[in-house]
Amino acid sequence: MSEHQYILALDQGTTSSRAIVFDHQGNMKGVGQQEFRQHFPKPGWVEHDANEIWSTQIGVAQQALSNAGIRASDLAAIGITNQRETTLIWDRATGKPIHHAIVWQDRRTAPYCDSIRAQHEKTLQDKTGLVLDAYFSGTKVKWLLDNVPGARERAEKGELAFGTIDSWLVYNLTGGELHITDATNASRTLLYNIHTGEWDDELLRILDVPRSVLPEVRNSSEVYGKTAAGLLGAQVPIAGIGGDQQAATFGQACLERGMAKNTYGTGCFMLMNTEGEAVPSQNKLLTTVAWQLDGERTYALEGSVFIGGAVVQWLRDGLNIIRSSTEIEALARTVDSSEGVMLVPAFVGLGAPYWDAYARGTMVGITRGTTKAHIARAALEAVAYQSAELLEAMQKDSGVELKELRVDGGASTNDLMMQFQADILGVPVIRPKVTETTALGAAYLAGLAVGYWKSTDDIAHQWQEDKRFEPQMSEEERSKLMRRWKKAVARARDWEDDSEA
């Protein structure tokens, strides 16, 4: 076997670290996966131990190589994709984190966001394409600097480094040599100007973050450096970085304007390619960098739903309605409909197009005849309804009418949910042969940088359809259900107020 036959993708997710080896055809050759602990120190707070993230990530990388029956010397490159916005600060001298990582789902900075909203929201939105929300990294960085004893002074002296998870992985992979991020991850911090492609002094001033902690922003596809000697058995080029949702968009080959994908993971994330135009949203969507190749930025509109597949975990762990996540489809299929039950899973507030931090989970339409099967079905449908609202907003903003939706992520294997998604959208929903599109996108980014794949055309030709779900619902029925859904959402909104939250 000649060397450099494969690409290794590191996929650092919210609940697990994974690694996948891909070949030239984009087929998976070996996989490693390990869950890690979620820490919930207070209501609304979510943290990860960054050392555990690193140890599980390097562990699964070795596992994937061994499962593929190859060595590090067989790799052409490594690509990295990561849970976005999750925020970490470490000591440059020791490489030790000064606190647990604050996860994207964490709401501790919501009151701070409210306090600066009137004065700064417009500036932040115009420059970053984001809404002012606790979800993004900037306010988390400020919280760490203000709440970890001595952190701000040490940051001013240049002793500390901030990074999203991609930065932390590259730092550790290179033995502390590189402190970098890519444009997609930088575009999720509230500190980066998506129009100039640089960290922005005005944004840094608003959020009180010193420039000295920031990583260098690089392309999403270029050779950044090599893995440290002794780490994997050979020094491998690290050549691609993309935030998970952007990487999935690339892996789904949504390479032209108006192409869109939806990833059904813990949350749901829909991105539509808008090419070189950073389309400002009038409907509370995000404008974000989709990828940056050779200094050229491609943009996307993004809508995020906080609770997607996580609603199934709640049925399993919170209500014990199912024993394992895989049982939900069979249970939901035992009834023909939810019999009018609507479940709005606003467990941590609502994302796009509402951005309501004070909404809470709500179930309406329950009668004595309601069973766990109706609740299971309502839970699956809730994911599709939330995604339909994102698409509605996207079409309004972009002026592009969607022809099809490409889907991926864990819950996209649920045929019942995908059929309902097509019904409620009124467009075909298409699942590709390789549903690990996040990791595949990272592999593509890395492979392009080292010439393993020659061009984005190569990538577009690799994408293959596995199953197509055609809409089967009448326009009248669709409108009726969407009206009912919006009524249910209205019941869930503004539930907590500041004084109670």
Swiss-Prot record:
One Pfam family per UniProt: FGGY_N
SUPFAM superfamilies, per database record: Actin-like ATPase domain
Any one GO molecular-function label of the UniProt entry: glycerol kinase activity
Binding-site residues for ATP, renumbered to this chain: 14-16, 266, 309, 313, 410
PANTHER family linked to this entry: GLYCEROL KINASE, SUGAR KINASE
Control of this protein's activity: Inhibited by fructose 1,6-bisphosphate (FBP).
Kinase listed as a keyword: yes
UniProt: ADP binding residues: 14, 18, 266, 309, 410, 414
Catalytic reactions of this protein: glycerol + ATP = sn-glycerol 3-phosphate + ADP + H(+)
Name of the encoding gene: glpK
Domain of life: Bacteria
Enzyme kind, highest EC tier: transferase
GO BP annotations, alphabetical order: glycerol catabolic process; glycerol metabolic process; glycerol-3-phosphate metabolic process
Residues involved in glycerol binding: 84-85, 135, 244-245
Alphabetically ordered keywords of this record: ATP-binding, Glycerol metabolism, Kinase, Nucleotide-binding, Transferase
HAMAP family in the record: Glycerol_kin
Protein name (Swiss-Prot/TrEMBL): Glycerol kinase
